[in-house]
Amino acid sequence: MKALNISIFSLLSSFILFNVAALIIILNRNKTTFIIKHGINLLLLSSLLAFIRLILPIDLYNAKIIDIHRIYKPLKYFLVLKIGNQLFIYQFLLLLWGIGTVAFLFYYLSSSILEIYKLNHLNCIPCPTLETLYSNYMHPKVIIKISPEVDVPKVWGFYKCHIYFPNYMLSPDEWKFILAHEVQHIKLHDTFIKMLLLFLIALFWWNPIMYTLRKNIDQMLELRCDSKLAQNYSLEMQNKYLETILKVLRERNTSSLTISKKNLTASFVNHSAYSLTRQRFEMILNTKKLNKNRTFLCYCITVLLFVSSYFIILQPDEKMTTEPGPTLILHTSPNEYKLYINGTFSKNLTPNEVHSKKYSKYEIIEGSN
């Protein structure tokens, strides 16, 4: 017998457990105290494990079964209803899922290509200050462009990365902060993460929680960049870094440029997410350090919960049930009778016992050995 399998019930279990995990992640992402106490990487790890649980719906044979017979029975009745003469509802839903996935993949692919095309055809201008900073420590496979058509600093790329800067009046230190932030996005491979998120959203386009989780993961990536930078900054530099965020936000709010799409790019600020900006300030100004032992324990518990989730499956409990056999007396020979109770042989009876009051209620069936 195989140790594991994939069934409709393992898919259902994965979907439900993913949604539960996603809701917990979203709720805790909005709690600054939780992030300060446990770190943003715990939420990112939880998000990764939640997605793995969703796309690997393994059904273990020794998993604990949670009986959903009462839910499954009417659901099954609904799914096997026919639409017309040949198409069942479940077939229609699978067809709709497939068409939707193809449509969303096409939409995200085309909009991402258009986004990158527009960025690569910007009207660029020189910026000596930024170019000097760039030449000091940037990797040669990173391309920098400055353009008045860019609304906020942003970055994208895999093998060769591109950083785009707006034509803002900023000091060398402010440009340095922005440059360092965008370089962090490159080092942490955030474009690749965003691309995977787009694929998963296209695959599970019918699940509204996916869109909310994607938005929160985007914000977590910004918080992670801030955390990486701030841990090496002095208090004075942290304050200047926050002042730079505010200055870029003010510049963006006074700009007449339309908000650009951000399917693959990661930007320095999000002018429409006030709560995120406030959270960035609270985290950078926080003076408490993470407890490494507690953080490691939280990681272990998270991984343990992920592994243990495979030992739970939601499905109708298929216990073997047998209908009880008949209770009767079988006449096998002139002086031999056999008593069967619930279909199971009990004992032999004599003719006197058979006709006694005790056994008179049982039917006598003529038979043979």
Question: Predicted segment positions?
Answer:
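Extracytoplasmic catalytic-loop and juxtamembrane helix elements of membrane-embedded
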Residues: 65-75
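Short linear regulatory motifs and low-complexity interaction segments
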Residues: 312-369
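Membrane-embedded and juxtamembrane structural elements of multi-pass membrane proteins
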Residues: 2-67, 80-313
